[in-house]
A protein has these predicted regions:
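An aromatic- and glycine-enriched ligand-binding surface/loop that stacks and positions planar moieties
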Residues: 1-148
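Active-site beta-strand/loop architecture of penicillin-binding DD-peptidases
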Residues: 138, 144-178
Length: 178
């Protein structure tokens, strides 16, 4: 359903719901929105991305389908961090428009998984310890992702510092970020 929301805004061919559309042709008229906001490791021939990093407030403004507020559930009733099996599990049950608006951990863009992860939770002595690595694209001892290619990372240009990328109005088409 989230993909349908994205397609409603981005796919013009055969879409009877398009109200305003403007075509851009590289040799005649261009814009830089996709260029400046594409997911970091999916840039084509540029070094720019993540000009707009959606905030947690925006993500949490999308309520859950059961009618509850959109606040992400990251701690249990005992104030312990919840460790999810998959990065996308924390977003389960959210309004599908979130997917059409924001690239968040555990999703894809252009059919490619995005790597948004800031560390790992390690089970030791009956509790989880959180471990981070400042190196983008790093792997933990077990071969899994430690810190994703796409961040988040503070104070680094062209990398999301919030853990989210904008999806809405960023074209998935080849050459859109060139």
């Amino acid at each position: 359903k989230g993909k349908n929301f994205y397609d409603m805004l981005m796919v013009k061919d055969g879409n009877k719901e398009i109200i305003f559309a403007k075509d851009y042709i590289a040799s005649l008229k261009v814009h830089r929105f996709a260029y400046d906001n594409i997911v970091r490791h999916l840039t084509e021939d540029n070094e720019s991305s993540s000009t707009i990093s959606p905030s947690l407030g925006l993500v949490e403004s999308f309520d859950y389908l059961d009618g509850s507020k959109g606040t992400l559930k990251y701690k249990d009733q005992n104030n312990n961090y919840i460790v999810y099996d998959k990065a996308s599990d924390i977003f389960k049950g959210k309004d599908a428009r979130l997917y059409g608006t924001v690239v968040y951990p555990g999703t894809t863009f252009r059919g490619t998984p995005v790597e948004i992860q800031a560390g790992v939770a390690i089970w030791r002595d009956g509790h989880y310890e959180l471990s981070v690595n400042p190196q983008l694209g790093s792997n933990y001892d077990d071969g899994g992702v430690w810190t994703g290619l796409d961040g988040p990372k503070d104070n680094t240009p062209d990398v999301s510092n919030t853990g989210f990328y904008i999806r809405k109005f960023v074209s998935e088409g080849a050459g859109a970020s060139a």
